[in-house]
Structure formats: C-alpha cells, structure tokens
Swiss-Prot record:
The protein's name: Ribonuclease Z
Enzyme nomenclature, EC number: 3.1.26.11
Annotated source species: Natronomonas pharaonis (strain ATCC 35678 / DSM 2160 / CIP 103997 / JCM 8858 / NBRC 14720 / NCIMB 2260 / Gabara)
Binding site for Zn(2+) 2: 65-66, 210, 268
Active site per UniProt: 65
Length: 308
C-alpha cells in the first residue's frame, strides 16, 4: 500500500524563486490530503502533478504563509465543477476567521466546504487502518501539528511451519492468517499464534508546521518514518529562532533523535538560505543519526513499511 509525500512549499514566511510558502501533499492509496496551503499552492499542485482531488486540508495555524493559497485553490476547484465536499481543519476557535477569508476571497464555492475546529490530541480522521491525530505545537499563534498513524499490520504467516504442522495449502492458510484457529482431519487444532508472527507496525508521518522544539513533538513522533519539522534557521540565528517561535536545524535534529525517527525533512527554510540550504542540512546531519534532508519544492518521498 503506497504512502507518498510531495513537498509543495518549503520556504519560510517569504517565498523565493526556488521555494514556495508552506504546503505538503500526502497521498495514501486513494486518499489525498493537503497540509497547509500557502500562497501559490495551487500552482505548485499543477507544476508537480498532484491534481486537485484532495478531500481534506489540515491547517496548522492562520499565518498568511500557511493559508493564503486556500481561497485561490477553492476558486479553481469551483471553476473545475467540483462537487465533492472538502473538509478543512484548523485549530479550535479559528473556524470563523478562516471562513471569513474563504467567503471574502473565494466567494461561496458551489461545493460544500466544511471548516472544523481541532484540539490537541483529537483524532481528526479515524479510518479503518489509519488515523490522523492533532497535537499542540509551540508557535506565536494558536498552532497544531498533525500525525498520520497507521494501524499495526498482521504478523507474517510462516508457511513452512504451517506445513510442518500438517495444515493443507488452501483456505486454512487464510483462516490462520486472519486470526482463526483451524481443525485438521485428525482433530488437531492449530492456533494462529503457532504460525503467525507478532503484529508489524504501520507507518507514521508527522508534520509540525511552525514550532519551537517541544517534548510533545518527541512523543508524537516516536519511531516516525518521516518527521517533517520546522528548521527555519541555522544555529547562528538561534536567538532569532527563539524570538520568532521557530526552530533551528540542530533543534529539529535533536527532536528527531529523541523520537528515534527514521528520516527528518527540514522545512520552512528562511529566505536567507535561498541560494544555499547546505548549512541547514549539514547542521542536522551532525546532530541526527538518521537521514536528514532539506527537500526541494516538488520532491516526492515514498514511505516504505518499517520492516521493508
């Protein structure tokens, strides 16, 4: 089952010729979701071929570089005769402000746009085999991050062991893998735990939006396959990072290390690094044992299962 992240906007508050403002597109099989929607996001979606068929948009906070692309995107969806509803999620208490922006700049789209308030710890999406959970972050506006967390998968079926126990190839294999005991012709009962391994973890992708480093992020991002973290500045601007409620690359790397994340994507890169983000990447590499990288706009990352 595919899980893929496309970085649509990786710049800080100011866009550059190389990087747009904040937006991340996530596709999990047929589910398409957008995390933040900075100015120009719809053009990035056109450039990088994601399409507009998103069903949900998760907004971390209501600063312009995270929301000003939403009215234009909704207007284009409307021009394209969209009928399917769009659910938009914002920090609790901010619904009216976002609705005002939509109504003022996009008019009233002809398709349903549901604006929902979200609180820390809330399960925003509860699907059959994954959920999206909100968590509080530390910025100078009410802000949330979001984590996509897949359910555990069945353990591996040990065909060789099943055959040793006398289980005939066929439907009984499927029954055992589904967690059902089976009875053989001689009356022997084979239990699933005899031939099925321990449950295997699903995947986890965590997006912080703008934030200072927090213990809450460490908890949510534990064993994350991909942590997408604010890394606006390098350490030589640590005071500015603290003053503006952002993180340095080293701070993001420390969070990823403490969470034992597998990969760290450094985003919301200040325009001062527009020509050369290597100080950000190098700083994170020095502090994080996993893979740390500064994605370019348009980069797509496939998320394999942890045991692959």
């Amino acid at each position: 089952m595919s899980l893929r992240v496309t970085f649509l906007g990786t710049s800080g508050a100011v866009p550059t010729t190389r990087r747009n403002t904040s937006a991340v597109f996530l596709r999990r099989e047929g589910d398409r979701m957008l995390f933040d929607c900075g100015e120009g996001t719809q053009r990035q979606m056109m450039r990088f071929g994601t399409g507009f068929a998103v069903s949900k948009a998760f907004i971390t906070h209501l600063h312009g570089d995270h929301i000003l692309g939403l009215p234009g995107l909704l207007q284009t969806m409307d021009f394209n005769d969209r009928e399917e509803p769009l659910s938009v999620y914002v920090p609790s208490g901010k619904q009216a402000e976002l609705r005002d922006l939509i109504d003022t700049a996009a008019g009233a789209p002809s398709f349903p746009v549901h604006v929902n308030g979200v609180s820390d710890g809330q399960v925003v999406v509860d699907a059959d085999d994954y959920e999206i959970r909100a968590f509080e972050t530390d910025h100078d506006a009410r802000s949330l991050g979001y984590a996509l967390i897949e359910a555990s998968r069945k353990g591996r079926f040990d065909r060789e062991r099943a055959e040793e126990l006398g289980v005939p190839v066929g439907p009984k294999f499927q029954q055992l893998h589904a967690g059902e005991a089976v009875e053989l012709e001689d009356g022997t009962v084979v239990e699933p735990e005899q031939v099925v391994g321990d449950p295997r973890p699903g995947r986890r992708v965590v997006y912080t939006g703008d934030t200072r480093p927090t213990d809450r992020t460490v908890t949510v991002a534990e064993n994350a396959d991909l942590l997408i973290h604010d890394a606006t500045f390098a350490t030589d601007n640590a005071d500015r990072a603290a003053r503006t409620a952002h993180s340095t690359a080293a701070e993001a790397a420390d969070i990823a290390s403490r969470a034992d994340a597998r990969r760290l994507a450094l985003v919301h890169i200040s325009s001062r690094y527009a020509g050369d983000p290597s100080p950000i990447e190098r700083e994170a590499d020095d502090a994080f044992g996993g893979e740390a990288f500064v994605p370019e706009d348009g980069d797509t990352v496939d998320i394999p299962f942890p045991d692959e």
